Design a protein with these regions (language model features):
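Short beta-strand edge/turn micro-motifs at domain boundaries
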Residues: 22, 153-178
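Positively charged n-region of N-terminal signal peptides that target proteins for export
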Residues: 1-4, 19
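Short, cysteine-centered beta-strand-loop-beta hairpins and adjacent loop/turn segments enriched
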Residues: 94, 143-153
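Short, low-complexity N-terminal intrinsically disordered segments enriched in polar/charged residues
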Residues: 18-71
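C-terminal motif of bacterial Sec signal peptides marking the signal peptidase cleavage site
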Residues: 13-16
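A solvent-exposed, acidic/Ser-Thr-rich amphipathic alpha-helical stretch
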Residues: 74-126
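A short hydrophobic beta-strand element
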Residues: 132-142
Length: 179
């Protein structure tokens, strides 16, 4: 389901950048129930009803969490995360547990770095109107400098699910930068 959601969020981003408008017609009096005028080869298993109805405060909180990571401020980063958090790491590992346990994992990794530079290339607020769930998706390049001198750069695409002003699910996809 996470891969499907990733594909949907990427498709939504690409389509939202298009200046051409696609006409949709309402199939009922419910404003969230819309049918595409185009006969599509797939039906979304999660949802195809998206808006950008995520608060600017939630967007700022998510983007600030990246700044806190870059600055090594794990205490502030912790405040952005829910009490219970699910994380899908870019290496395929999964974490489902308490905020404090996640911060121990992230602190250990961040402590191995002397600096982190993030070039935030873009973001998109996404609200699943039928599921009533908000997300902030991000695209960025991160350059990590390890204390031993090694420098590693990669491009990332993250999905941050936001509930009650906190990140409760975080999924990360990584593509190494060419050397």
């Amino acid at each position: 389901m996470r891969k499907i959601f990733f594909c949907l969020s990427l498709a939504f981003f690409i389509l939202s950048c298009n200046n051409d408008t696609t006409k949709t017609t309402a199939t009922s009096t419910d404003s969230t129930a819309q049918k595409s005028a185009v006969d599509l080869p797939y039906t979304a298993s999660y949802t195809s009803n998206w808006s950008t109805d995520v608060s600017d405060a939630d967007l700022k909180m998510v983007l600030t969490s990246y700044k806190d990571w870059a600055d090594g401020n794990i205490a502030n980063l912790s405040k952005s995360m829910g009490d219970s958090v699910s994380v899908d790491f870019n290496n395929g590992d999964h974490f489902n547990g308490k905020n404090a346990d996640l911060m121990k994992i992230w602190s250990t990794y961040r402590d191995s770095l002397s600096s982190v530079a993030i070039d935030m290339e873009g973001w998109q607020k996404m609200y699943a109107t039928d599921k009533k769930e908000g997300f902030v998706v991000t695209w960025y390049k991160e350059t990590d400098t390890y204390k031993m001198g090694k420098v590693d750069s990669a491009y990332y695409h993250d999905i941050n699910q936001v509930k009650n002003g906190k990140i409760t699910w975080y999924s990360q996809y990584k593509r190494p930068a060419k050397k």
